[in-house]
Amino acid sequence: VAVGSSSHISSRDGLGTSSGTEDDTPGAAGRREGKFTARSERTLGRAGGGPPQIYPWMRKLHISHDNIGGPRGKRARTAYTRYQTLELEKEFHFNRYLTRRRRIEIAHALCLSERQIKIWFQNRRMKWKKDNKLKSMSMAAAGGAFRP
């Protein structure tokens, strides 16, 4: 290869060639990919009980963009115990809004963070608002149907 010619890349690097040889055919590309896959499986120790093979149908369908959910990724959904839910519902029944002091007390009593308590109450208020809107609409519709 001439010193001034940098258009040729070794096919051993897995990047293919840019000179018009027969290695540019689609079949050759498939053979190169097959060699790379076999080589990478050997390097990962696949035969020694490594991670299971991931087939194309097991991969994610949607491409995620970098740093949308922050560096940690998507937060897992909190699963509240029945006891926690019952206590939160009881508190909501008496007061739909919490003071900071009461939020801290509940968080310590239920072993949850203040943030979880705050968000639970926000979500519960939205549910309450939606339920009341549906009730008022159904009562208005029922009242209109029974007029003499």
Swiss-Prot record:
A GO term from the CC aspect: nucleus
Region ranges (Disordered): 1-53
Compositionally biased residues, Basic and acidic residues: 30-44
Disulphide bridges, residue numbers: none
Entry keyword set: Developmental protein, DNA-binding, Homeobox, Nucleus, Transcription, Transcription regulation
Chain segments annotated as transmembrane: none
Pfam families named among the record's database cross-references: Homeodomain
InterPro entries per record: Antp_homeobox (IPR050296), HD (IPR001356), HD_metazoa (IPR020479), Homeobox_antennapedia (IPR017995), Homeobox_Antennapedia_CS (IPR001827), Homeobox_CS (IPR017970), Homeodomain-like_sf (IPR009057)
One MF annotation (Gene Ontology) recorded for this entry: RNA polymerase II cis-regulatory region sequence-specific DNA binding
Membership in a protein family: Belongs to the Antp homeobox family.
Annotated function: Sequence-specific transcription factor which is part of a developmental regulatory system that provides cells with specific positional identities on the anterior-posterior axis.
Protein name: Homeobox protein Hox-A5
Naturally occurring in which organism (per UniProt): Ambystoma mexicanum (Axolotl)
Lineage: Eukaryota, Metazoa, Chordata, Craniata, Vertebrata
Encoding gene (name): HOXA5
